[in-house]
Amino acid sequence: VTKREGMDKLLEFIRKGDFYTAPASTRFHSCHEGGLLEHSLNVFHALTAKKTTGIWQEKLKDVAYESLAICALLHDLCKTYFYTTDYRNKKNEQGIWERVPYYTIDDKIPYGHGEKSVMMIEEYIKLLPAERYAIRWHMGWTEPKENYNALGTAMEKYPLILALHEANLEATYLMEEKQ
């Protein structure tokens, strides 16, 4: 629980939107109704577990639980109002064509991924620098290679970036179902 100014308005934005019903992706991890919430909670569990484990105990000792929660639960806020449902024909087990729903992207705010989440969050609350950087860079080494120097420098300054990136990967590849 946080007393951060504006959190009530951010939570209202989340409740009124599709955060609880949106998928986390169109065809990969948690690509089902409620997948974004599921993924965010999985990242939260993976990230908070790191704080008490191995090398992360030292690296994250000064990072408040509140910051872990904000980063993990809101890192993909940019995926709200991002997906729509469309339909296509697909053969069922009997070989009969059926009209089936699938998720597609409708990016109304083409501002990047981590950057957009930071922008959306900061419409309501002020992020701490480590939170801002962690959310911005949470995709880690999937960034274009031209960004690797900046990413590496940022990770050295804020280990929370790497911890969130790893937690995101753990949730995606170890905790969630693929389609």
Regions inferred by a protein language model and the residue ranges of each:
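N-terminal intrinsically disordered, low-complexity tails enriched in polar/charged
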Residues: 1, 178-179
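Divalent metal-dependent catalytic cores for phosphoryl transfer on phosphate-bearing substrates
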Residues: 28-32, 38, 45, 50-52, ...
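Non-catalytic interface/linker regions that flank or bridge core catalytic/transmembrane domains
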Residues: 1-22
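All-alpha helical catalytic cores of prenyl diphosphate-utilizing isoprenoid enzymes
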Residues: 9-16, 29-41
